[in-house]
Amino acid sequence: MITITLPDGSRREFEGPVSVMQVAHAIGPGLAKATIAGQIDGGHLVDASDLIEHDAILRIITPEDQEALEIIRHSCAHLVGHAVKQLYPEAKMVIGPVIADGFYYDIYSKRPFTPEDLAAIEQRMVELIAQDYDVVKHITARHDVVRLFKERGEDYKLRLIEDMGPEVTAMGIYHHQEYVDMCRGPHVPNTRFLKAFRLTRISGAYWRGNTKNEQLQRIYGTAWADKKQLEAYMQRLQDAEKRDHRKIGKAQDLFHLQEEGPGLVFWHPKGWVIWQTIENYIRRVYRNSGYGELRCPQILDVSLWQKSGHWDNYKENMFFTDSEKRTYAVKPMNCPGHVQVFNQGLHSYRDLPIRYGEFGACHRNEPSGALHGLLRVRGFTQDDGHIFCTEAQIEAEVTAFHRQALQVYADFGFENIQIKIALRPDKRLGDSLSWDKAEAALRAALSACEVEWQELPGEGAFYGPKIEYHLKDAIGRTWQLGTIQVDFMMPARLGAEYVDERSQRRHPVMLHRAIVGSMERFIGILIEHYAGIWPTWLAPVQVVIANITDAQYEYAEQVHKALLNQGFRVNIDLRNEKIGYKIREHTLQRVPYLLVVGDREKENGTVAVRTCSREDLGAMSISTFVERLQTEQVV
């Protein structure tokens, strides 16, 4: 007998091995019809057809559950493959993973897909869904899978199988009628669960993300549990399109990117004002929190990166250069440099914690297909800091950082924050005991802060677990920003030591921390969060003064000088244009305040104040307006 325990504590007994779907049928036909997959003993998800061969706790996954979304999206990717192979039999399927809010499928085709092709593929998917067919899973021996894909000419699937270790002797093959694909699953049991989908765009990609390899075509899509969720998401996409930081950046003359420097940003004067304002704000955070700001070299001999572990775990993402028979790496991270500063002199336990901060410029060799405006670049600057402390100080330091980070996010207008702990990955440095201690320290710190968090198994960095801060923006999108990581490994690898109270040398704990992360990415997020309507303290131009006629020329200059002397970012528009034209132009540029001066304002020593939201605040004295501006300054 096999006993299945359900989430409400009730139990069902079966004569022998039983599938998730059979359990659902035993409970009722309504649940069986809604069953997508199952979760066994609170752990991994399994297909509805998978057998349970021992006593277990079973949670049946339906479209109402959050876990269903990834299953639906992954199944939709396979449905793309089914439709593409019916319409374009010569195409070769590559990979089709789930991504945030959707999925994509990489495909090799000699003929480029067009928007008309995308519409045809989507229509064929609709037709296939209407057939209401079952998705059938077979666990298949590796050699049979190889034979299957050879017969079908799926060269990329064969390459993926070659990448698998010899321990993989069988794999899941999912049958969509005549179309087959391999996957770990789980997938939906029937196409009726896939009705709420949309294909969104086509882009280029490269096999294995390497520009030296053959080019692929990537079909993006989104899928949801029902049509209402899909429509809400499509509306968010429209809202996001209006907020696209690349469009706003061009319209406001903030930055640009060009082919000669892929993933490298050219900052224009207005954009650099925003950068400097944020940098000065973070610099104040450093100072108030006891960090010493430093600066480390851009390139360092590869021997240091070999010692730190980056060479073995990260070299494919690094840039290298040679000089005088030595190989140097352009730094992808700042941490090894900070350890070198710590190592200049022997520290006592009384000196700890020691906190370093740097606006560290890093470079990472990201695949060209992954680059996206400011949000995914190759050259970036981090508000990077490292704390050297004892194990006993970890909780206090993480707690202080947590409170500091929440204040920073609030100052930038983010209130909805989710906290996650990313736990040990398969590929990592150090032993299990060190990881146990590091993960326990992060949990203890968050418990002390009385906050809730989610745990992400396998998503930590190779040198330590980390706390992640995920922020929701104005249209509900989630962005991962700040992190703090416990690292017991790197100080030992790079020889960092202090003398403890017993006069013995010990390795400090190293905490890696960043609040905004990449400055480039953070500014891109802010542009989209604010939709280009900057809060006054961040706006590249805070005020524009516009005269109505030449008769107010000198008075406008006086107002301009008075505001400049107060430290505000002010422009003056003395052009011989109609005042309505000037107002429209500067309103479209989203300048927070427009001060109009005519004969009445000149006579009374006032300014007529308008906002970029077209609100008329009436006449104010210059001193009253200055007080208003000062209340809106964060730095």
From Swiss-Prot:
The keyword tRNA-binding belongs to this UniProt entry's keyword annotation: yes
InterPro entries tied to this protein: aa-tRNA-synt_IIb, aa-tRNA-synth_II, aa-tRNA-synth_II/BPL/LPL, Anticodon-bd, Anticodon-bd_dom_sf, Beta-grasp_dom_sf, TGS, TGS-like
Cofactor: Zn(2+)
EC number: 6.1.1.3
Pfam families: HGTP_anticodon, TGS, tRNA-synt_2b, tRNA_SAD
Compartments reported by the entry: Cytoplasm
Role of this protein: Catalyzes the attachment of threonine to tRNA(Thr) in a two-step reaction: L-threonine is first activated by ATP to form Thr-AMP and then transferred to the acceptor end of tRNA(Thr). Also edits incorrectly charged L-seryl-tRNA(Thr).
Annotated protein name in UniProt: Threonine--tRNA ligase
Species: Xylella fastidiosa (strain Temecula1 / ATCC 700964)
Gene name per UniProt: thrS
